[in-house]
Structures are given as structure tokens and as C-alpha cells.
């Protein structure tokens, strides 16, 4: 890990007063690594409130969050074996980030995260169509930071480069999730109810300058989806359903700290096309969704596409 925030502190100390230099946190590098791991943990944790392939754009105040995720899970055999995978890209841009590193000075950081997470679990039936699914997860990712400190580029005073001082961090995560869900039919309505608790612990890979930095992703997800057949609407001559969904993600610990919010809620609508008549192997339906996003510090939207197997 290149000492992103430590470089920032050094640059500021070289260009401002000795009093300001004394306010620099000497553990800035470890703090930067923990911040980077916290941001990466959000991207690497599967979010069931969004579609399998989704684009999210949210902003508020001095923060912006953009992410793309490709997520899916299925049972390859007739038994309870369940496999899950996620590939995600996220860009998070807060201002006044970890202000204790340089007291009274704004730090504008753009964190770009790429993550891949896999999961292996087993599905057990409960009662009344409810099922429980414990899953073990392994994740790999990289987060890169570009920063602007006190309205000027993070550039050493004697450097001939015109690039921002930036840095990257490779990390791995390991953890587990427990999901409880139900799929049922109520009259013409098909409904899904899902509860999921996910915990992943992230640590840097071969980054001695990161010190003892680590971060955890601890998220609780509540989600529901309702489908209603549109008998008089056919797209591409295929049966169509109206889809309504809503969910909330509750963030705990490091995830809540780095996002500065304890929750993120979504609600949306869309159309689902029955694809069983097309001959596509294993695919039962395709779904297009538009969701609104709201949180304490954010608001925005998400566009997603999903498949039902």
C-alpha cells in the first residue's frame, strides 16, 4: 500500500505551518488501509436488494456512490447444494474523509473497488415453504484511491510529475452468510420473502505498510418481491408479469462508518418475460427493473436485469 494519506500529510506539512504539521496523525497509512478495506467490503458483499445485473447511481451532499454488480446463485443438482458468485465494480467519492488525519482540512478521495466473491452452501427446507441457506464465502479484490488534499493535488513539492499521488490495495475476505427465504403463491400473486445476514472479514494481501488494518462487512438484508400476471400484455409474443419489489440493507460496523449511514432502502417496479417457450436452457424468465434508492446520506436510482432459473 502506498501511503496515500501519509503522503497527503507530508505534502501539507511541507507547505503549511509547523503547527499544522504537528496535527498530522502518524498512523495515517494504517487508517488509509482500513478505510480502503471498508470501502472494498461494501462492493464485495452480495446485495440481494438489487437485480442480478445492476447499475446503481446515488449521491448526496459531498458524497457519491456508483456501482455495477453481476451476481447469481443456483442449485446445480437436485440436492441442496447451492453455488453463488459476484463480480462488482464500485466508485465511492466522499469529502472530509477521516478528518482526524489532518485536523480541519478537507480530503477528497475517490475509491475505486473491483471485487469477486464466491460462495458455497446448502439449502435446508423448514416449514410452510420456508427454507434456510447457510453459505461460506471467499472474496478477492482491489481498491485504488485518488485524492485531493486541501484543494491542491497530492504532489510532493520537489516532484516533476503532474499525476496525483495515488495508491492501491489488494485484499482477501472470508466469511459466511445465513439466508432464510420463502417463495409462495397467493391467488394470482407470486411472492418472495428474504432475510439474509452476511459477515465478511477483509485483510490486506502482502501489504506490510498497512500495519494491522482490517475491516469487516456486516450487513442485514430484508427483501420482498411480488409478481402479478399481465394477461393482456405480451412482449415478443411471450407472457409478461408486473414485478414490484422493496428491500433494505442495514449496515453495521465498518460499512456503516465508511458510508456514514446505517441503512439503504430500495423500491422499484419492472416487467418479467416468461422465456420458457423460447427454448433457452435452464432460464425460466428475464426481468428488467427500475429502483429508487434512499439512505441517510444518499438518494438515487438503480437499473437492473435479472434471470430466473
What does each model-found stretch correspond to?
Residues 23-26, 77-223, 248-252, 256-264:
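Outer-membrane pore/translocation modules
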Residues 72-76, 120-124, 178-186, 226-230, ...:
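Residue-level signature of outer-membrane beta-barrel architecture
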Residues 20-102:
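Short glycine/proline- and aromatic-enriched beta-strand/turn motifs that initiate or cap beta-hairpins
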Residues 41-43, 80-86, 131-135, 190-194, ...:
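Residue-level detector of the transmembrane beta-barrel scaffold of outer-membrane proteins
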Residues 208-309:
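Outer membrane beta-barrel transmembrane domains
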Residues 49-69, 110-112, 260-274:
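Generic detector of solvent-exposed, compositionally biased contiguous segments
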Residues 1-5:
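Bacterial N-terminal signal peptides that target proteins for export
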Residues 6-15:
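Bacterial N-terminal signal peptides
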Amino acid at each position: 500500500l502506498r501511503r496515500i494519506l501519509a503522503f497527503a500529510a507530508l505534502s501539507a506539512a511541507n507547505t503549511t505551518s509547523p503547527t499544522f504539521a504537528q496535527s498530522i496523525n502518524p498512523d495515517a497509512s494504517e487508517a488509509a488501509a482500513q478505510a480502503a478495506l471498508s470501502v472494498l467490503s461494501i462492493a464485495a458483499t452480495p446485495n440481494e436488494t438489487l437485480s442480478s445485473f445492476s447499475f446503481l447511481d446515488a449521491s448526496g451532499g459531498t458524497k457519491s456512490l456508483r456501482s455495477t454488480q453481476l451476481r447469481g446463485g443456483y442449485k446445480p443438482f437436485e440436492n441442496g447444494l447451492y453455488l453463488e458468485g459476484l463480480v462488482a465494480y464500485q466508485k465511492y467519492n466522499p469529502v472530509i474523509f477521516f478528518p482526524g488525519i489532518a485536523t480541519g482540512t478537507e480530503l477528497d478521495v475517490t475509491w475505486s473497488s473491483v471485487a469477486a466473491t464466491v460462495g458455497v452452501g446448502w439449502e435446508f427446507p423448514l416449514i410452510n415453504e420456508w427454507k434456510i441457506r447457510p453459505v461460506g464465502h471467499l472474496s478477492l479484490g482491489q481498491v485504488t484511491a485518488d485524492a485531493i488534499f486541501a484543494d491542491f493535488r497530492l504532489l510532493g513539492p520537489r516532484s516533476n510529475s503532474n499525476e496525483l499521488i495515488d495508491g492501491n490495495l489488494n485484499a482477501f475476505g472470508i466469511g459466511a452468510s445465513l439466508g432464510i427465504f420463502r417463495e409462495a403463491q397467493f391467488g394470482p400473486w407470486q411472492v418472495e420473502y428474504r432475510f439474509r445476514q452476511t459477515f465478511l472479514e477483509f485483510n490486506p494481501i502482502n501489504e506490510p505498510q498497512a500495519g494491522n488494518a482490517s475491516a469487516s462487512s456486516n450487513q442485514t438484508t430484508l427483501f420482498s418481491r411480488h409478481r402479478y400476471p399481465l394477461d393482456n400484455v405480451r412482449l415478443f409474443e411471450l407472457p409478461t408479469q408486473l414485478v414490484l419489489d422493496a428491500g433494505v440493507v442495514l449496515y453495521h460496523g465498518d460499512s456503516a462508518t465508511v458510508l456514514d449511514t446505517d441503512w439503504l432502502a430500495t423500491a422499484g417496479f419492472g416487467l418479467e418475460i416468461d422465456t420458457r417457450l423460447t427454448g433457452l436452457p435452464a432460464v425460466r424468465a428475464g426481468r428488467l427493473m427500475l429502483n429508487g434508492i434512499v439512505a441517510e446520506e444518499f438518494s438515487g436510482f438503480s437499473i437492473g436485469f435479472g434471470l430466473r432459473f
